[in-house]
Amino acid sequence: MENPIDSLLLQPIYLSVLSFFLNLVLLLILFGSWLFKKRVACEDTDAIMNEEFKHISFSYNKLVLICCVSLSVFYSVLSLLSCLHWHTNGWPFLDLLLAALTWGSISVYLFGRYTNSCEQKVLFLLRVWWVFFFVVSCYHLVVDFVLYKKQEMVSVHFVISDLVGVCAGLFLCCSCLWKKGEGERIDLLKEPLLSSAESSDNEEVTAPFSKAGILSRMSFSWMSPLITLGNEKIIDIKDVPQLDRSDTTESLFWIFRSKLEWDDGERRITTFKLIKALFLSVWRDIVLSALLAFVYTVSCYVAPYLMDNFVQYLNGNRQYKNQGYVLVTTFFVAKLVECQTQRQWFFRGQKAGLGMRSVLVSMIYEKGLTLPCHSKQGHTSGEIINLMAVDADRISAFSWFMHDPWILVLQVSLALWILYKSLGLGSIAAFPATILVMLANYPFAKLEEKFQSSLMKSKDNRMKKTSEVLLNMKILKLQGWEMKFLSKILELRHIEAGWLKKFVYNSSAINSVLWAAPSFISATAFGACLLLKIPLESGKILAALATFRILQGPIYKLPETISMIVQTKVSLNRIASFLCLDDLQQDVVGRLPSGSSEMAVEISNGTFSWDDSSPIPTLRDMNFKVSQGMNVAICGTVGSGKSSLLSSILGEVPKISGNLKVCGRKAYIAQSPWIQSGKVEENILFGKPMEREWYDRVLEACSLNKDLEILPFHDQTVIGERGINLSGGQKQRIQIARALYQDADIYLFDDPFSAVDAHTGSHLFKEVLLGLLRHKTVIYVTHQVEFLPEADLILVMKDGKITQAGKYHEILDSGTDFMELVGAHTEALATIDSCETGYASEKSTTDKENEVLHHKEKQENGSDNKPSGQLVQEEEREKGKVGFTVYKKYMALAYGGAVIPLILVVQVLFQLLSIGSNYWMTWVTPVSKDVEPPVSGFTLILVYVLLAVASSFCILIRALLVAMTGFKMATELFTQMHLRIFRASMSFFDATPMGRILNRASTDQSVADLRLPGQFAYVAIAAINILGIIGVIVQVAWQVLIVFIPVVAACAWYRQYYISAARELARLAGISRSPVVHHFSETLSGITTIRSFDQEPRFRGDIMRLSDCYSRLKFHSTGAMEWLCFRLELLSTFAFASSLVILVSAPEGVINPSLAGLAITYALNLNTLQATLIWTLCDLENKMISVERMLQYTNIPSEPPLVIETTRPEKSWPSRGEITICNLQVRYGPHLPMVLHGLTCTFPGGLKTGIVGRTGCGKSTLIQTLFRIVEPAAGEIRIDGINILSIGLHDLRSRLSIIPQDPTMFEGTIRSNLDPLEEYTDDQIWEALDNCQLGDEVRKKELKLDSPVSENGQNWSVGQRQLVCLGRVLLKRSKLLVLDEATASIDTATDNLIQETLRHHFADCTVITIAHRISSVIDSDMVLLLDQGLIKEHDSPARLLEDRSSLFSKLVAEYTTSSESKSKRS
């Protein structure tokens, strides 16, 4: 018995009544609004309205207006035809008449609208009405189809009316959600009042997407100019339009942050709250894409629903004239809707994903800016960069899949409904079969989450170590340790690869189950029909098969969806966990505005500790006051807490107790210089505008003018990463210049003078501290006692406490700590006095002679010549298409490519079995009940099941082969790339920002690990699938080739037209990622400096700008892809419709209805499959750019061999340690100027040689050449008669020892830092620690030699790090030792002890010392003085000091005069 409610709902008359009353209500509201406006109208309303309408944007308001007018005209015509031609009356006629009146009223209302507050409510109501209209029209259309299926008469004009209503309603609903360029919702009913000038300005900055009309957006024609440009030239980054302002990172970030903080009063960020804030920041795109996904899903099932009717029509069961063409039209319209909604869905989803990535990158960066140092020790730079480079990208990629879970539920529901209509009760078995498939995947999904989490942790560990190694590559090469650390990274990769292997094989299992699912579900349903004795007819079978084929897509995609859900969940958890870390305490420092207090710095009962859990605080009992304008010096032994005190004033050290107040703006000069990659000028300005006069004064005070003249591009020279092309002294003085230029109130100097020579140090102290900063508050840490007498207050520190405080003469006799420091300094001066003849020159004379000397050598060296190039070059970018060689090399990585043909064979076999099973079901089932089936039901199901099992087995084999091959290729690519990176020369690292390398090691490697194998497999699967479909269709009606051949040609042409622009957009997007990673890494390393200058907003703006650069390239790359896919799907849809027309036009009986139905079943997916194949091919090429970039690094020129077997030196080499240099010429690159100019000298074996000279004169370059870090351009160096160029690098570097200028420690333990090669016993290590004055410090630690060392040794002071480096050489005991500013960061007393240790342990060794402290080289046997890359003097110190005109004598005089004069003034 029929349900009465269903009967009621299906009566057209009741639908007409409902529609009539909805129209009537809206008319009454519009009439009431009109009356209200008449009462409150102003005199100038008409003028405003007319002016407003004059500037209405055609792309929005007029299209909506035209749509409403068209509907009014349409319903008017339809009502007249109903009355005059069809003789319809009653409610249907009244409904059409009132609809015409309603849409006419809306049109008049829109044309004459006003902009008052009351109006907004009416505008909102119109939007609601449009949604209702769309829903009611859809319901009308459904009723039409149901009535049609019941073979009841349906009026044609009703069907036409409902179709027009659905299309117009969809357009009006979509228009409600479109946005405008200024970041606000487009009000389709209201435009802002803009003058012509303002409109013009707005058009100049608005992106093409925001200016595009509705038709342009629907067809993606707004991308056509850029794609056309890509065919005319190679697209550069300046050719790509900007993002719309509402889509910029800044706009989205502040929305995201406000939602996150508003929802999180406790500052506790959970994964759910993070998801919620992400959704609210891009909700419009997500909601619109969800609506489009819903319409797409419904439209996909129109064809299966009508499949039985189509087969019956071909079989001769025709219900009315032209039924075939009506069916073809319905199929065609459904496919058009499917095409349009899918493309817009994907585009909007990816747009939302880009927005989420932007806000996450900015939020992670923002967190990095507020992260205290103790939190950073738990999360290294590599881990944080991984969050930004991998996890944020993964969440962005999830936008492809975010609607899939609920869409799958909808699709399964629709499929079960259609199956029920086709198979009756037998379809019920499909439901438990589907549930069983889902349950079978549950354990695999849980394993996937576990494997993914472990995979990301292991990736973090690898990236952490990679980042640390790249940062310290120079010291690794100097020590000959690079291959040892490479093996550590390969071990970490091996652990990662273990989890990766489990992950990909688990994914293969999921893949196999779900790919076999459609066959399993269909076999279950058909078997149930057999058991229930439900007759199987070909029409119903084909409807079921068509449903299963549509269901195949989401089911096949389900493994990837599950994988992405798991990966995204892990990434969200990791980011949420990171964002939950404690921020830097804001209440550590009480900040007062400039000039509000006489006290600049005041600490009362202060206790500070880097580690809250430590029983012994870092600083305790801190009590002192610093008045405005005071000079305060801080001194003490290594590790006494000097740098920590400055960090406490900056607010970097957590406060345990006490009060700290700071009045005014701060500037900070770190002990280890932090220099940004960029121009020298940019480093000095540091965000402030150029003031030329002040800028020149700063350069003069910092003694930088001479250095800038030497640099190839003066202050426009681009500094390499970490200032690699500058000397230590130059970096320090640029850092000082940066602080001076800020014109702050309080200056904090952390021992900046130790990195420069005595003359430069004295000049800086006089011109900076006593000159430009004479009226400023200055607090400086120093180990140089000669700079103490000028201080208004001296703080002497020991073990984290201030032991003495006062002026120089007040504390000189009041305690032993200060006396020890001064005594050591006096002893050093006495050593110098015993060597020199007492000559001391006047400084003015020295300066004058230096100027003459500089001018003369500038002429000799040709430094006025034009420079030939910058050290840091733009990132390499391939041009044109990705070459076949890249594909060939990539595929050959796994077993020489032998597995690839096997995968193709398995896939072809699977395709044949799949088509065969469906062909079998179609062939043996009768067209109608009247025809006797040729085989029994048991045979029918048995053969189908056997074919399905065989095809499932092929799926399993294919999945395993793809996983195995992809894993092998990714692993080999990783190994080859890293091997070449570690074997690259230092010139590569000098010219390549670390971010570029990390980008390849993280993002590009992730693509190779997880994305590329699946992409390759899908291309093969889709291509073979398409060939199979075309084969099936051609077998039925070969005439379709007439249509397919030109369509395929057109598709190929479109692909070729598109790929030029798309390829370059993808490359530019890949390149634009590196600056983001590099900026991130650079910021984390200099975070203390950035915070001290209050530069967080500027750096936040920089990361947003860099993120926007990537987003706009990715956005337009996505737009280009959808531009192509839309056109391909449109062509395929026309081809599909043409095929249907051929089938229905054929004479009855010519075409087998069952086979024709099978052909249509396969053809239903042809448009999507063909477009997806082309899209995947293009995306594969874009993804192959990652492989291309990694392969670039497998072709990096390597250093000379590590070992040359034929010329290996004896184990005792070098036995004497004699170094002979002949005509040595050195430059840092072929395009860079010469640094050393023809040096010739000899370092006698067993003697100690000191190398001195002004900052930047070439001292460190000479040492780098000795270790072959830089290869000579000409000349040679011989050690004990062996040319160092003739032996392997490892044999050379492992026989030499060096304490480098920049002390380096690696994450690990004290033991692993002293003995990374594990060659020495604990007793030997303890002996080395005692000799380098660190033994007692390490014994205090609970874990002794296993005490932890954090990333870059951040939990040890710079001086202690330098002592650890000294401990390494004491263990190694090489015959030749180089000290490159080895004691620059330690106090004089410790320096004297170390010098004594070196004299004792290296008495018979050749020792080369570079030092700015004259006391460190004065007792050398020989002194070599360099100036601008030339040897000026080379003799014993005594002989040089005898010659009062020698440059060395003048250097010593400057040092002693400066020190003694300051001591006397005290």
UniProtKB/Swiss-Prot annotation:
Listed binding positions for ATP 2 are 1253-1260
Q: What class of enzyme is it?
A: translocase
Tissue specificity, in the record's words, reads:
Ubiquitous.
Record InterPro entries? AAA+_ATPase, ABC1_TM_dom, ABC1_TM_sf, ABC_transporter-like_ATP-bd, ABC_transporter-like_CS, ABC_transporter_C-like, ABCC_6TM_D1, ABCC_6TM_D2
Residues that hold ATP 1 according to the record: 636-643
* Protein keywords: ATP-binding, Membrane, Nucleotide-binding, Repeat, Translocase, Transmembrane, Transmembrane helix, Transport
- GO molecular function terms attached to this record: ABC-type xenobiotic transporter activity; ATP binding; ATP hydrolysis activity; ATPase-coupled transmembrane transporter activity
One Pfam family assigned to this protein is ABC_membrane
Region ranges (Disordered): 840-876
Q: Which reaction does it catalyse?
A: ATP + H2O + xenobioticSide 1 = ADP + phosphate + xenobioticSide 2
Which coarse location class applies to the principal site listed for this UniProt protein? membrane
Question: What exactly does this protein do?
Answer: Pump for glutathione S-conjugates.
Q: What is this protein called?
A: ABC transporter C family member 6
Instruction: Tell me what gene encodes this.
Output: ABCC6
